[in-house]
Amino acid sequence: MKPTVALVGRPNVGKSTLFNRLTRSRDALVADQPGLTRDRHYGQGRVGEKPYLVVDTGGFEPVVDEGILFEMAKQTLQAVDEADAVVFLVDGRAGLTPQDKIIANRLRQLDRPVFLAVNKAEGMKHAIAGAEFHELALGEPLVISAAHGDGVRELMELVLEGFPDEVEEEDSRHPKFAVIGRPNVGKSTLVNAILGEERVIAFDQAGTTRDSIYIDFEREGHTYTIIDTAGVRRRAKVNEMLEKFSVIKTMKAIEDANVAVLVLDAQLDISEQDATIAGFALEAGRALVVAVNKWDNLDGEQKENVRREIARKLNFLDFAKFHYISAIEGRGVADLFKSIDEAYRAAMSKLATPKLTRVLQVALERQQPPRSGLIRPKMRYAHQGGQNPPVIVVHGNALDSIPASYTRYLEHTFRKVFKLQGTPLRVQYKSSENPFDNDEKDKPRAKPKPMSKMRGREKEVRYGKNSKK
């Protein structure tokens, strides 16, 4: 599982700048998805062979003009407590402040690594920039410039030193799904409905604040693993009014699942947080099933309004199946499993190269990719580049400027033909020269003869053999 790194510090020390630098390589994965609005306080990154999740806790801090920190928001404290490592950012130009000391006192109580990074040190000698911060007793200060990238790689290499390199994902032979969603939408009720009251009691166990609970169970002869982020409890103990939303726990659960079940509350408007959580799953490439809960509490007109709002605000989830359920009554829960199975099969599909190439050729016959300047991209063949989510690699020439709209056209075509309902689909391009191409248009043109050998013939053509100059 990817380690989670929390960025901590008082306002205006450069947390957002550092966050953007650490996550910029991942932004393009969802940037071209129409309708997706993404909260920029979480993301993914990589240093060499080590991937990581990163959370900018500054996004959860209250915005106040005075009396700042350490009355950090509850979610900031929760994120710090749940992270695998913490980067404490201070301002090398402003120097040590009372707020820095208060935050450091809290961080010294943690039982996980804390790395002190002195930011905004452009043009300063490292020894001078970090000198006064030794007082915080958090180890040797690491001097960086988030704006220019100086020292950032060295910082992250040190942070990730104790964590293993990326390993191949476990080839799960059955669906492993996470129930995700914002607070108070009925996740715990749905988990209880899925497992059954007896099953919940049998598996009732204390989980730590940092870990979700993994439960294997069988349903109609099929094996599943459910990842419960809220904690499995007896129904009498469930009090969703007290439920806290954990960004880190949700991110980790999605990363470790092969299917995510997103729970929405039909009685509430689709919120930014709903779209953000959906964005987690989309960026991670996870298969997705959406459960719209408390559906039985609405009348006909209200139901139609909810459907319209979902279509407008979550249109980037057009690949997912939507189910309208009542978790507390158990209505619609059985149908969820049909979609979970379908999404899992789609995510783990194996796609044959000959058929992929034939489908590509049909798509090209219907609609060619647009020209980029004077050059039209040429697509030759396709093969599968990965699973969970399925990745289709298209080979050809001049494929560096394919617009997002044409990529979505190909995604739609592949999805329809291969019946990839319920999973995101990635189409990637690889430009290369094809030495076996016999297309006359691609053959190099004959080189013109040297002028010295053409001089006499040129004169004959222009003047004639017996013409006078």
Curated annotation (Swiss-Prot):
The cross-references to Gene3D superfamilies, in alphabetical order and at most eight, read: 3.30.300.20, P-loop containing nucleotide triphosphate hydrolases (3.40.50.300)
Q: Does the keyword Transmembrane apply?
A: no
User: Could you state a single Gene Ontology molecular function term?
Assistant: ribosome binding
* Superkingdom of the organism of origin: Bacteria
Enumerate the InterPro entries for this protein: AAA+_ATPase, G_ENGA, GTP-bd, GTPase_Der, KH_dom-like, KH_dom-like_a/b, P-loop_NTPase, Small_GTP-bd
Keywords from the named record: GTP-binding, Nucleotide-binding, Repeat, Ribosome biogenesis
The protein's matches in NCBIfam families, at most eight in alphabetical order, are given as: GTPase_EngA, small_GTP
Q: Where is this region: Disordered?
A: 429-469
Please cite one Gene Ontology biological process associated with this protein: ribosome biogenesis
Q: Where is the EngA-type G domain?
A: 3-167, 175-348
Instruction: Name the family the entry cites.
Output: Belongs to the TRAFAC class TrmE-Era-EngA-EngB-Septin-like GTPase superfamily. EngA (Der) GTPase family.
Q: Where does GTP 2 bind?
A: 181-188, 228-232, 293-296
UniProt xrefs under SUPFAM superfamilies: P-loop containing nucleoside triphosphate hydrolases
Ranges for domain KH-like: 349-433
Is this entry keyworded Flavoprotein?
no
Q: Which organism is it from?
A: Chromobacterium violaceum (strain ATCC 12472 / DSM 30191 / JCM 1249 / CCUG 213 / NBRC 12614 / NCIMB 9131 / NCTC 9757 / MK)
List ligand-binding residues for GTP 1.
9-16, 56-60, 119-122
Q: Which Pfam families match?
A: KH_dom-like (PF14714), MMR_HSR1 (PF01926)
UniProt xrefs under PANTHER family: GTPASE DER (PTHR43834:SF6)
The protein's name in its UniProt record: GTPase Der
| Function field | GTPase that plays an essential role in the late steps of ribosome biogenesis.
Could you give the subunit structure recorded for this chain?
A: Associates with the 50S ribosomal subunit.
